[in-house]
Structure formats: C-alpha cells, structure tokens
Swiss-Prot record:
Conversion of fibrinogen to fibrin is triggered by thrombin, which cleaves fibrinopeptides A and B from alpha and beta chains, and thus exposes the N-terminal polymerization sites responsible for the formation of the soft clot. The soft clot is converted into the hard clot by factor XIIIA which catalyzes the epsilon-(gamma-glutamyl)lysine cross-linking between gamma chains (stronger) and between alpha chains (weaker) of different monomers. A long coiled coil structure formed by 3 polypeptide chains connects the central nodule to the C-terminal domains (distal nodules). The long C-terminal ends of the alpha chains fold back, contributing a fourth strand to the coiled coil structure. GO terms for cellular component: fibrinogen complex. This is Fibrinogen alpha chain. The modification Pyrrolidone carboxylic acid is found at residue 19. It comes from Gallus gallus. Residues 1-18 form the signal peptide. Residues 270-307, 381-510 are annotated as: Disordered. The gene is FGA. The lineage of its organism: Eukaryota, Metazoa, Chordata, Craniata, Vertebrata.
Length: 741
C-alpha cells in the first residue's frame, strides 16, 4: 500500500514539473495560439453554426472561433457596406435626375415669364412717357383755359360797355325826339325801356359773378418721376451667387426695377415777419429805431411802427325769383387779423392815414385801442404785399436835426390824384407833454376799381409808421380836429390777397372771415396756443357749417394701429373733396378743444343707412393722457361714448373721462391692453362700446373667430348703431366751437 502511495506522489510531482516548464515543442513555436485544425468532416458545417461560444483566454484551446467563423463575419460586414454604398449611389442618381428635371422646369418657366417681364418693363417706360406728356398737355390746357377765361371776362366787360352805350344812345334819341316836338314834320312817341336795361344789367352782373377759375387752376400738378431702383450696398462677398449653369439662364439681368415717385409741390404761403426775422414775399419793410434823448424826460419811451389794415367787403348777389331778379348787398368790415374795425366806420373813401409818434404804448388805447397789440417791443417789423414808393421824413428837436430812413408813400400817377398834408401841429390827447418834435405825414388819395366774382372789395387802411423819435409838449387845442378822419377807398387786388391768405383759429373762423370760407375744402388754420399752421378740411355744408374734420375712415387705406407718437402728431390725409382717411393728431385736437367744443360723429353702414351723434367734448393735455371729457348726447346713432354698452355695463364700457391708449402706451382700465387686442388707439375703458379706429373690414359683418391673433370683435364699431361684429363703411369725427352756435 505504501509503495503505491509513493508512486502516486512522484507521478504528481512529475506532472507539476512538466506543467511549469516549457517543452521542446513549445520552445520551437508550437505553443502559439491560432486556429484549430479541423478535420474535413467539419468544413461543411462551420458556415451554418450560429451559436459560437465566447472566447476568453482561459478557454482558448476549446472555444476559440475558427477561421471559418471569422471569414463569415467579414463577408457579412462587407455585404452590409456594399448594400449601403449601392443605396447611396441610387439616391445620388435620383437626385441628379430630379436636378435635371428642375432645371428644365426653371428654363421653361423663365421662357414663359421673360416676355411678360420685358413687356411689363416696356409698359412702365411707356406709362412714364405718357404721364409726362399728359401732364404737359394738362398744363397747356390750363393755360388755354386761363386765356379763354380772360377773353370771356373781356367780352363780358365789352358787352356791359356796349349795353351802357346803347342805353346812352337811346336816351339821347329820346331827348332829341322830345326836343323835336312842335318843330318837326313828324312826331314819334318813343319811350326808353329802362326796366329792360336794368334786367339786362342784373343778368350781366350775375354772369360776371360766376367763378370761372376752378380750384384746379390754383393748384400745381403733381409730377410722376420714374427712376431705376438702386442696388443694395451690401458687399459682393456677402451675396449669394448662382451656379455657373444658372448664371447662363438668368432672365433678370435686363429687367430693371423702377421706383415710381409722385412728387407734390408745396403750396406757397405768405410768411409773416415778426421780431428780428427776415420777411418773405414782401414789398415793403418797416423798421423802427430806439433812442434815448434825455433820461429825465423820455425815459422808458421808444418808437415803433406797425401797419393796421381794415377791409370793407361789399358783396352783391343777384337772385332770380318769381318777381324777377333782385339784388342783395352784404357788407363786412374786418381787419386782416380779425380784430374790430368799427372805429373806422364812416371814413372818407380814398384816403390812407399815417400816424406817428412816441410815448408809452399803453397810452395809445385812448385814441385807437386796437393798436396796442401792434406796438410791442418784440415786434418791430411788419410786412406788406403792396408795392410802395419812398419818401423821407424830417424831424427837428431843439437845435439839432436828424433824418430817419425811408417810410412809404403810395403814388397813383395814372389817376392824377396826389397830395401831401402836414399834420405836424397835431398831437393826440393820449401823449404827455414835455418835449417838442415835428413830424410830417403823407396822406395819399387813390381811386381804382377791382371786381372779382361779382363782388366789389373796398379797403380802409390804417398805417402807422415812425416819423419822429419823440413826441412831447406841442401846445394845441384838444378839439376833435386832433383825430384825423379815417376814410379810404381802394379796389386793389392786394386786399383780396390778404383775405385769401387768412389763417383762422378754426373752421368757423374761416367760414366768417375767409374769402372762400363759405365753401368746403382745405384751409390753413392756426389754433390758439400754437405757433404751427395746420392744413385742415373744413365742412361748411353740414348744419351751421364751420365743422373741422379730425377723423375719417372710408376705405381702409390707412393703418390705424399706430404708436403713441403717431397718434400725437396725426397721420393720413384728405383731398379737397374730403376723400381719404386721417387722424388729425391728439395734440392738435387738444388745442382745438380747449374750450367747450361740439363733436359730431357721422356713421354709415354698408347698406347706405346713416346716423349721427353729437356731444360736448374737451380733450386734455398729453400729461393728462389726452383724457376725453364728454357729455350732452344728441343724435340718432345711440349714446356709445357716455352711456356705453348697456349689456356689458356702463361702468366698463363708457368712454367718458378715459385716457387715450395705444399698443405701446396702455392707459385703460383692463388688466390687458385694449389697444393691442382691438387694433387701434382709442379712449378705452374695459374695453369699448365704440371704436372708430379699429380694423377696417369690408362688407360689414365679419366672423371674429378668424381674426388673428385675437379672436375678438375688433372692427370699426359703434355698438348702439350696429352689432359688435359689424364693421362700418364710413365714419367721421368733426368738431366746431360751441360758443358760436
């Protein structure tokens, strides 16, 4: 038993030694890892074996994959990549075919569009030439019309003179026939038809009163200018360049983009010189000098000059009635600035009075109260459109003498009337005594005739200019002779020009004082508290006249979803016939409604039904948010501004005392922005019962579900008149002063 055990131990030790040491086979390289050598019987089955075990270092000898398995894996991967490459090649081929197809379609499209684009370009050029030629012909026609109108006027004057001559001849014949009675062989009973001549004269007067100078004669035609649109200033390396194939197919190299500009020339206006500013369009400039001779006698005195003109307008109208033509005469007498000229009533016609002197300006109101506003230290220059001659006035104070610049003297040598009167010994009672001076004024008498439109214009002018530096204690009696007789007669067209260029404070002032104020149209006004002259549309045909258009919507051509500054300044425009869309501007509306003002809202739906609403309104300042004060509703449209929308509650929809809101300045009472949601600036509450500045929807009814981005009734609405989903066709807002009603 023991030997067997010893034998087993020795055998184990031998095996362990053999395991630790390398054999000769391994030393010769036979121990390297590699594919197992398989018998022929296993070659056919290795391709189909799928569940190969995982090979690790410990199991390399029994589980290592054979070369057959590795070759299969390589073949599968190669086949996969080959399929991918074939797929990519197929997609490239398809894209190339599509590219060729798209190029062919582009070429066909270009060939179709190119003739049309070239034809359109030619039409644009022809349109520019035709419009230029048309404008030239219109200007020629206007000149011919003006020539024909002058010929018609000359013929009217000739016919009138012939009628007068015929009447005179008939009267002479009647006198001779009457003188022949008793001494002639025959006698005739001849009577002059005086009534017939009077009717002819009235008809001629009525014909001459027709205005044959239409409005377009006084306006300058706009000029249509077409010029090529300049290319952008972007550098070339930032621009996308087409491929060489597409460059050959470019059809727009010869097509030029044209910019069409309609230039409207600015209308000339008469500038009024004030202070140290230089006058424009003037024929005479009157300046003043300030000197102090003696501090003890004439301290705080100065001399200034001003021109005050009063115009008397006599309008004759011939009205045909059942009893025959009858004549109406309307006489007005106002100054160019709208002040009272009643103190000049009863003056002698054909004279111009020049008053000169120095002293405290406030003392002049004893003689001429209206002149106080003219004698100010800040206003030392005035302008006049008359063509005036020149004269020199001499002034003597004490032992010295001085000569001041040129004054003005009207000369009418063709009338044969010219005289000079010396008023040096006169001193108005309003000046204090203390220093002596001598002044010389020129009184020029004139007479001429001017008739336009059947109306005769007579002018009375009060001109004051500096003729002495001091006016002191010249002793004279205090009788009525100290005040000269203010009488003048003038038919010069300058008076008419002054009236035509009159800038009123509102349309009601224009209606009363402007020559063409009785007609609706574009006029220039200067609101109280503003130095800016506005061009506004005045409606003189609606009840009482004097309505100033501040808002209008009629075709949706103007976007009313504007900023606060846009609504402050105003936007849009209307033509001379009142066509167009505009917002006059919150600042201008505030200036025009500082006093109680009547607001008239006119509405029209798409069926032609009209309604109106009138209120008494005031609009606050910008610091107050242009708050709307509104009351006293009258009309047929329903009270939307004060009462609001009764179904939603007046406290939420009334616009009274509300501030103006725009999408960039939210001043409403809603937690969100009403102006942003409803698409326009307005006096929102929470939010509205009326909004005349909303989105303009043609056709009337609209579905708010399709409104983007807010599905809400945001049209031009006046809910008491039409439903909230009905957008009105025409809306207008007009104002006029309440005090003139």
């Amino acid at each position: 038993m023991i030997p067997v055990t010893i034998l087993c131990v020795l055998l184990c030790l031998n095996l362990a030694w053999a395991q630790d040491g390398k054999t000769t086979f391994e030393k010769e390289g036979g121990g390297g890892r590699g594919p197992r050598i398989l018998e022929n019987m296993h070659e056919s089955s290795c391709k189909y074996e799928k569940n190969w075990p995982i090979c690790v270092d410990d199991d390399w000898g029994t589980k290592c994959p054979s070369c057959c398995r590795m070759q299969g894996i390589i073949d599968d991967t190669d086949q996969n990549y080959s399929q991918r490459i074939d797929n990519i090649r197929q997609q490239l081929a398809d894209s190339q075919n599509k590219y060729k197809t798209s190029n062919r379609v582009i070429v066909e499209t270009i060939n179709i569009l190119k003739p049309g684009l070239e034809g359109a370009q030619q039409l644009d050029e022809n349109y520019g030439h035709v419009s230029t030629e048309l404008r030239r012909r219109i200007v020629t026609l206007k000149q011919r019309v003006a020539t024909q109108v002058n010929r018609i006027k000359a013929l009217q004057n000739s016919i009138q003179e012939q009628v007068v001559e015929m009447k005179r001849l008939e009267v002479d014949i009647d006198i001779k026939i009457r003188a022949c009675k008793g001494s002639c062989a025959r006698s005739f009973d001849y009577q002059v038809d005086k009534e017939g001549y009077d009717n002819i004269q009235k008809h001629l007067t009525q014909a001459s009163s027709i205005d044959m100078h239409p409005d377009f004669q006084t306006t300058t035609l706009s000029t249509l200018k077409m010029r090529p649109l300049k290319d952008s200033n972007v550098p070339e390396h930032f621009k996308l360049k087409p491929s060489p194939e597409m460059q050959a197919m470019s059809a727009f190299n010869n097509i030029k983009q044209m910019q069409v500009v309609l230039e409207r020339p600015e209308t000339d206006h008469v500038a009024e010189a004030r202070g140290d500013s230089s006058p424009s369009h003037t024929g005479k400039l009157i300046t003043s000098s300030h000197r102090r001779e003696s501090p003890s006698l004439v301290d705080k005195t100065s001399s200034a000059s001003s021109v005050h003109r009063c115009t008397r307008t006599v309008t004759k109208k011939v009205i045909s009635g059942p009893d025959g033509p009858r004549e109406e005469i309307v006489e007005k007498m106002v100054s160019s600035d709208g002040s009272d000229c009643s103190h000049l009533q009863g003056g002698r016609e054909g004279s111009t009075y020049h008053f000169s002197g120095t002293g405290d300006f406030h003392k002049l109101d004893r003689l001429l109260p209206d002149l106080e506003s003219f004698f100010t230290h800040d206003s030392v220059s005035t302008s006049s459109r008359h063509s005036i001659g020149s004269s020199t006035s001499s002034h003597v104070t004490g032992a010295g003498s001085s000569h001041l610049g040129t004054g003005g003297k009207d000369k009418f040598t063709d009338l044969g009337e010219e005289e000079e009167d010396d008023f040096g010994g006169l001193q108005p009672s309003g000046f204090a005594a203390g220093s002596a001076s001598h002044s010389k004024t020129v009184l020029t008498s004139s007479s001429s005739s001017f008739n336009k439109g059947g109306s005769t214009f007579e002018t009375k002018s009060l001109k004051t200019r500096e003729t002495s530096e001091q006016l002191g204690g010249v002793q004279h009696d205090q009788s009525a002779e100290d005040t000269p007789d203010f009488k003048a007669r003038s038919f010069r067209p300058a008076a008419m020009s002054t009236r035509r260029s009159y800038n009123g404070k509102d349309c009601d002032d224009i209606r009363q004082k402007h020559t063409s104020g009785a007609k609706s149209g574009i006029f220039k006004i200067k609101p109280e508290g503003s130095n800016k002259v506005l061009s506004v549309y005045c409606d003189q045909e609606t009840t009482l006249g004097g309505w100033l258009l501040i808002q209008q919507r009629m075709d949706g051509s103007v976007n009313f979803n504007r900023t606060w500054q846009d609504y402050r300044r105003g936007f849009g425009s209307v033509d001379g016939k009142g066509q167009g869309e505009l917002w006059l501007g919150n600042e201008n509306i505030h200036l025009l409604t500082q006093n109680d003002t009547l607001l008239r809202v006119e509405l029209e739906d798409w069926d032609g039904n009209a309604a109106y609403a009138e209120y008494i309104v005031q609009v606050g300042t910008e610091a107050e948010g242009y708050a709307l004060t509104v009351s006293s509703y009258e009309g047929t449209a329903g009270d939307a501004l004060v009462a609001g929308w009764l179904e939603e509650g007046s406290e939420y929809t009334s616009h009274a005392q509300m501030q103006f809101s725009t999408f960039d300045r939210d001043q409403d009472h809603w937690e969100e922005s009403c102006a942003e949601v409803y698409g326009g600036g307005w006096w929102y509450n929470s939010c509205q019962a009326a909004n005349l500045n909303g989105i303009y929807y043609p056709g009337g009814h609209y579905d708010p579900r399709y409104n983007v981005p807010y599905e809400i009734e945001n049209g031009v609405v006046w809910i008491p008149f039409r439903a909230s989903d009905y957008s009105l066709k025409v809306v207008r807002m007009k104002i006029r002063p309440l005090e003139t009603l």
